[in-house]
Amino acid sequence: MNQDNCRIKVNLKNNPYEVVVGSEILYTIGEELLRINIRTGEKILIVTNPDVSKPYSRRFITSLKEAGYDANLLILEAGENKKNYESIALIHNAAYEHQLDRGSLIIALGGGVIGDMAGFAAATWLRGIDFVQVPTTLLAMVDASVGGKTGVNHPKGKNLIGAFHQPKLVLIDINTLKTLPQREFRSGMAEIIKYGVIKDLELFNKLENEEDLSNIYSIKECVLLELIKISVSIKARIVEKDEKESGLRAILNYGHTFGHVIETLCGYGHWLHGEAVSMGMVLIGQLALRKNLWNVDDALRQEKLLTKAGLPISWPKINNEDVLRTLKGDKKVDKGNIRLIVPLGIGMVEILNDVSENEIKSLLESI
């Protein structure tokens, strides 16, 4: 590895692991598995999608086989509209066909949807087998691949079916971003901006100082590496303190409660996850203004930075009653109370557990 690559430890009590971040490290997967003591000869099922499989899977499998593993490939259609029971059944069928046992491994090679599905399939096959995350989208690199959340969507709500199942390893090669559509890249940038708002003023300032955040080719590789490392480190430290989201980890949901409403009501896939989160962040920013929790300047800074990243900031045209009904079914609702993460300033948020339905209704009517 060159000096720009790094290993970020996620120090969980029962399931510690490393996130390896670097450039041109995708095909070190075989040696990385040997390093974490995955025995040679074990069966490995790689779950990926067509856009990722075409440029990467052949050499990826070669790396595994050269390390002594029995590797097989399953190609699934990705996208939020495919994140369902049917796709999980396809993974389980492949696990049965290739005779995966409790010593076997599932590798997610792809974006957040592939990672969520492969992780959930691993969590539920034989009551749980190991899996590895190899994210190929910016959003998956800085968010979905770290922390052990896995699952699928339900027609009534996003990610309502799932499990906490920590990976054995996360391998991030930023070179895979070069084949990523620009819209997907911008979607991932929303999560990096989120980290700045919830926890890191310095990161937010750094993002503001970049001329263009909407195009991967306008950001220097060293800068992109640093942004990913900072984001992963922030999430790792939060997950270490609250693995199962009983308290602090909830701040990672900033913008997500309303973002998930958008994804559910507009149809999975109509808006990308980061786009929906961006609109959710702006709406929560407006709520914070109404409650005098932060100032207009910070709200405008957030909106300006999201716009610079090419992200939408205007709430879509959806029925307010549908929004309220969907909110009540969100997994972050506790005993009927709507729990929201609201900003106090750039780099600071707090959890509000008692936001009333009338407050939400008034907010929606004002935009």
Swiss-Prot record:
Catalytic activity, as annotated: 7-phospho-2-dehydro-3-deoxy-D-arabino-heptonate = 3-dehydroquinate + phosphate
List of residues binding Zn(2+): E191, H256, H273
CDD domains, per database record: DHQS
Subcellular location: Cytoplasm
Record has Hydrolase as a keyword: no
Any one of the GO CC terms: cytoplasm
Enzyme kind, highest EC tier: lyase
Record GO biological process: amino acid biosynthetic process; aromatic amino acid family biosynthetic process; chorismate biosynthetic process
Record carries keyword Transmembrane helix: no
Names of the cofactor(s): NAD(+); Co(2+); Zn(2+)
Cofactor binding remark: Binds 1 divalent metal cation per subunit. Can use either Co(2+) or Zn(2+).
Single annotated GO MF: nucleotide binding
Keywords: Amino-acid biosynthesis, Aromatic amino acid biosynthesis, Cobalt, Cytoplasm, Lyase, Metal-binding, NAD, Nucleotide-binding, Zinc
Highest taxon in the source lineage: Bacteria
Binding annotation for NAD(+): G112, V113, I114, G115, D116, T136, T137, K149, K158, T176, L177, K178, T179
Family membership noted in the UniProt record: Belongs to the sugar phosphate cyclases superfamily. Dehydroquinate synthase family.
Function in brief: Catalyzes the conversion of 3-deoxy-D-arabino-heptulosonate 7-phosphate (DAHP) to dehydroquinate (DHQ).
Full protein name: 3-dehydroquinate synthase
Native species: Prochlorococcus marinus (strain SARG / CCMP1375 / SS120)
